[in-house]
């Protein structure tokens, strides 16, 4: 929607006192906003109190400055019964925020965050819409129904496609929604209030790790839990009063040194970098898909401008953040460890797993998740594999190992391999094309199990490898018995 912000036409200059430069505010509160306040302070006092303690209030930016609409906007409606009848809209979209926060809004809408609503059609959404749910929620925009599991689950983080049902009113299946990739009636993607919650829009709140934890948690992307166990999370909670979270510029190494938060590493300013609202510009691996890929590859698929930024540049951007507190050698060595874990996951599990699932297709029922092995494979990469990768990125050892590579290996060898073997046996027994497909799968499975990464399963370690393992066990026993020092 294109908002008629009354004071926008008298702005003369943009000011840059803050890294997130905004345009000059109005000199006084508008009459329209005053009227909004007079009613809503009685009907919705929490809204007015929050706004009254915000920087928006101090800058004379009020209800009407954000919610004003043109009559032709898809979600505009005449707010009647008032002294001054004006068109407003319920949703304040990134396009509206861009009237003042142009740089931040542009960066955000060109980021992966803003594309989160494009989940429709993915395996995740198939689960919520069909397998977990049903079409029992019927609304004006969804007369045939939509899944409550998708509406109250996926869409609340990823964002809904907001539907207008007439006279500016929004379909209840799609609103309320503050999903980061919400698709708004004006065509914009994203929701600034996903991080800058209404109606205080606090930078300090957005800088807190819990702010990101609404969505970045759980079995498939437990960044919040990983942060809590990491040295960074421990330092944050121990020294929160030293974080200076309200600082306008909030430069790590200058305004604070106690700990980093999610925002520190992925968005906030350093002595050498400006704030960015494109959260992909410091990430050197995309660990969302079954096989980890470089971020410019996924950016290209989404048509993002950042596809031109190579992973090496993004890594240098992140290293600049790290080196506000850590030495260059420390940071370089961390990335050696991180890359090694990603390589382990990709080469030992992800690539062989994808190949085996492709070869197994002729032996599977066509409907996704109608086969036991569909669930096993999905959780291998989508849950355990992601946990290990994300934890390595954030230095969370328990989630890297016990919740990550341990669960990954346990289910690979105790579920995935036996389920492949079961498919092979059933295919052989069926004869014909199934038997031929089973023979091909047997070859692929044998190739995987006889590879250096997996041959232990067949008891095919070399004599040298067995000798090395025995020596390690013997040494451990000696250490436990106090016969040798652990540093010997």
Regions found by a protein language model. Name each.
Residues 19-488:
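Short sequence/structural segments immediately N-terminal
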Residues 1-5:
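Positively charged n-region of N-terminal signal peptides that target proteins for export
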Residues 7-19:
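Hydrophobic h-region of N-terminal signal peptides that target proteins for export
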């Amino acid at each position: 929607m294109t908002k008629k912000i009354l004071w926008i036409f008298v702005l003369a200059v943009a000011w840059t006192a803050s890294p997130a430069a905004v345009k000059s505010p109005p000199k006084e509160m508008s009459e329209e906003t005053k009227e909004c306040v007079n009613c809503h302070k009685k009907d919705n006092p929490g809204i007015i109190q929050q706004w009254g303690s915000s920087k928006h209030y101090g800058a004379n930016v009020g209800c009407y400055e954000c919610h004003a609409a043109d009559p032709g906007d898809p979600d505009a409606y005449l707010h009647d019964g008032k002294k001054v009848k004006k068109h407003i809209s319920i949703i304040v979209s990134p396009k509206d925020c861009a009237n003042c926060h142009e740089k931040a809004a542009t960066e955000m809408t060109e980021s992966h965050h803003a594309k989160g609503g494009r989940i429709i059609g993915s395996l995740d959404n198939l689960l919520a819409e069909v397998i977990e749910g049903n079409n029992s929620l019927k609304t004006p925009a969804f007369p045939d129904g939509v899944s409550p599991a998708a509406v109250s689950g996926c869409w609340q983080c990823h964002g809904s496609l907001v539907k207008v049902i007439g006279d500016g009113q929004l379909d209840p299946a799609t609103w309320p929604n503050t999903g980061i990739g919400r698709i708004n009636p004006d065509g914009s993607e994203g929701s600034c209030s996903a991080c800058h919650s209404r109606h205080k829009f606090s930078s300090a709140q957005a800088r807190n790790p819990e702010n990101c934890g609404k969505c970045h948690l759980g079995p498939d992307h437990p960044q919040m839990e990983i942060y809590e166990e990491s040295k960074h999370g421990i330092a944050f909670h121990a020294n929160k009063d030293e974080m200076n979270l309200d600082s306008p510029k909030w430069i790590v190494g200058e305004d604070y040194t106690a700990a980093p938060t999610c925002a520190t590493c992925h968005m906030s300013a350093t002595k050498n970098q400006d704030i960015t609202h494109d959260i992909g510009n410091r990430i050197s691996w995309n660990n969302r898909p079954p096989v980890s890929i470089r971020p410019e590859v996924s950016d290209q698929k989404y048509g993002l401008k950042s596809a031109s930024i190579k992973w090496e540049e993004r890594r240098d951007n992140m290293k600049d953040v790290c080196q506000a507190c850590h030495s260059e050698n420390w940071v370089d060595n961390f990335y050696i460890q991180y890359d090694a874990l990603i390589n382990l996951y990709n080469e030992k599990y992800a690539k062989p797993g994808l190949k085996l699932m492709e070869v197994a297709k002729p032996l599977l029922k066509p409907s996704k998740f109608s086969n036991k092995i569909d669930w096993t494979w999905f959780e291998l990469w989508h849950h355990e594999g992601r946990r290990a990768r994300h934890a390595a990125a954030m230095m969370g050892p328990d989630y890297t190992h016990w919740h990550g590579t341990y669960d990954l290996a346990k289910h690979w060898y105790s579920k995935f391999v036996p389920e492949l073997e079961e498919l092979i046996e059933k295919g052989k027994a069926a004869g014909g094309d199934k038997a031929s497909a089973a023979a091909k799968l047997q070859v692929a499975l044998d190739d995987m199990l006889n590879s250096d990464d997996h041959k232990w399963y067949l008891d095919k370690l070399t004599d040298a490898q067995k000798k090395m393992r025995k020596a390690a066990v013997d040494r451990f026993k000696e250490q436990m018995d106090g016969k040798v020092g652990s540093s010997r």
